[in-house]
């Protein structure tokens, strides 16, 4: 069966700095009309940095939509224009943590909320780390947090970390065997 829904008309309701909201008139595979609310997003990256000792560097920051301060991997949105995912990941890693990486190992692409948003989030594992100075954006207030990878696994396992990109990055690192001896077995 072909599950494709055909777009009939797009009605843009809001155009912001990081997203656009539209309401589409569409046609279901059976020919019946429907309405689809869509949030267009620039896309972004998330980077899980793991050093040679199995330590990870995360960021703690307030996330306004949830009204909570959370712990997550360094991340950010893609800039308008030609910036590729790896370049964006390197930029965000340095801005938020001061780290630069010899290697940016792709962990894949995830779609955080495909039911209403077209955001594509590219995940990386950063290796060969060198510490430098942070350069946070003007509106960004973050704290660097270092911990063993095994401790991060425990925070994911218990649900203390709810951030989807962080959970996905930890899972991909484990599945791809990129944690080395710092895996979660001892937790």
Predicted stretch roles:
Residues 9-46, 52-53:
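Acidic, metal-coordinating catalytic segment for phosphate/diphosphate chemistry
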Residues 29-30, 51-53, 62, 126-131, ...:
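Short loop segments at secondary-structure junctions
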Residues 20-24, 69, 120-122, 143:
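Short beta-strand micro-motifs in enzyme catalytic cores
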Residues 2, 48-91, 134, 187:
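Conserved Nudix-box catalytic region and its N-terminal flanking loop in Nudix hydrolases
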Residues 34, 43-46, 77-164:
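Unchanged
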Residues 175-187:
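Generic C-terminal helix-cap and adjacent flexible tail
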Residues 170:
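C-terminal boundary of histidine-terminating zinc-finger modules
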Residues 1-11:
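A short, amphipathic edge element
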């Amino acid at each position: 069966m072909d599950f494709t829904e055909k777009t009939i008309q797009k009605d843009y309701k809001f155009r912001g700095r990081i997203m656009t909201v539209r309401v589409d008139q569409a046609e279901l595979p059976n020919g019946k009309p429907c309405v689809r609310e869509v949030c267009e997003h620039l896309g972004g990256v998330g980077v899980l940095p793991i050093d040679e000792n199995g330590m990870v560097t995360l960021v703690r920051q307030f996330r306004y939509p949830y009204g909570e301060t959370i712990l997550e991997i360094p991340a950010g949105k893609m800039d308008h224009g030609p910036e590729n995912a790896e370049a964006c990941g390197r930029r965000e890693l340095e801005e938020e943590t001061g780290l630069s990486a010899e290697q940016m190992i792709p962990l894949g692409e995830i779609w955080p909320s495909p039911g209403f948003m077209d955001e594509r989030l590219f995940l990386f594992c950063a290796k060969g780390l060198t510490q430098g100075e942070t350069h946070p954006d003007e509106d960004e207030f973050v704290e660097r947090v270092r911990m063993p990878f095994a401790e991060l696994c425990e925070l994911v396992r218990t649900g203390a970390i709810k951030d989807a990109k962080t959970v996905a990055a930890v899972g991909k690192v484990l599945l791809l065997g990129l944690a080395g001896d710092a895996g979660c077995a001892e937790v």
